[in-house]
Amino acid sequence: MWRVYMKKILFAASEGVPFIKTGGLADVVGSLPKYIDKEYFDVRVFIPKYTCMKQEMKDKLRYVTHFYMDFNWQNVYVGVLEAEEAGVHYYFIDNESYFGGFKPYGDDPRYEIEKYAYFCKAVLSALPLLNFQPDLIHCHDWQTGLIPVYLKERFHGGDFYRNMKSVITIHNLKFQGKWDVKTVQSITGLPEYYFTSDKLEAYKDANLLKGGIVFADAVTTVSDTYAEEIKTPFYGEGLDGLLRARSHDLRGIVNGIDYGEFNPETDKNIVKAYNAVNFRKEKVKNKRALQEELGLRVDDKKMMIGLVSRLTDQKGLDLIAYVMDELCQDDIQFVVLGTGEERYENMVRHFDWKYGDKVAANIYYSDALSHKIYAACDAYLMPSLFEPCGLSQLIALRYGTVPIVRETGGLKDTVQPYNEYESTGTGFSFTNYNAHEMLNTIRYAEHIYYDRKREWNKIVDRAMATDYSWKVSAGKYQEMYDWLIG
């Protein structure tokens, strides 16, 4: 009997669920490997072992090996641990002087660069000792940007590494890992000629993400539209020229969400479970419960709009602030959950004080409350300035909560705007970053909700029928792996 050759993939990243999480990157690194076809791919993950990991997670780790490596002009300890989680093999790089502390990321950018340069070199150095020779290393964001560089530079001579390919995924182009050339050259030990404008140098600094983009065999980002946007100066964060040059190797693949965790039929956080068949009767019971819990006027018929977000400019809070007073004159309720810039936190608190029966400000973060908001609200507002992928709108669609979004990045790719003439669409959208354009779109949604309820429910039907599970995304990543490995 013939046997299929297992393609070996290694994920390298700075965080991953369930071990450590600060943002959406961890969800991707923790979820995607679970859904890659185990018959054809052997997928493993490398992340740092942070001292601030929860104790129950640390208890799962087993010692594998340790060694010493030349790094930053000294001989440095590298410990390697491992764990199995949801059928995926995880490895951890252990060095308390780099990964100690109360949080994964520190506030000193120079030290962060040293820390992740160490991580990149340690991952590559550890592989021969683990008896795992990946065909492809899948890197994520600037923290692993040096892996493609090191692969082509100091590790390229060894037989073990010679045919290894690399791909880098850009989750947010804003963060690039920049510091002065002299320091970064000293830390990384790379030759001087690597710090030219066609390699790691950008605008007189060394740039680790740029290094990854230049040296990786392919580049991906987290939605088709964002892949196009980052080739333009407005979204390109200074790297648009390079991304245009690499456009043949650049592709967008939308992130998924975990349909096990986000499922209105089985969600333990919500008062009343519901599904695509019975939402017309059952979903409103969650609204009633949330109105009582948050002290809003209890009214089944009142349109409730939700927002679960960091309260920052990137998320469009300046647009909301500009028209908030006008919006509060409408026959709606507005529920906000999240923290962020002080002026926006205070703005939301002010309107909660002024319109207590209409606005509920929850200036903290709670996973349980976020689920309740997704289940209770009729619409979900997401007017981002830029949004590489966005997960909130995918969760909203899953819960039959109609997204109102700005057409940018992943929002444009995942929310189909309502067309009343063709009776299509899964949400509402506006094009320009303009507060009154947003307000007009919200008011159009209000009109459909109040005056054409059957049409509204059909939008909900279509929203709940979309499939943005990880299974779909994993299929697209597998195609790319096949293309790269051959």
Per-segment meaning from a language model:
Residues W2-G486:
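Catalytic cores of nucleotide-sugar-dependent glycosyltransferases that transfer UDP/GDP/TDP-activated
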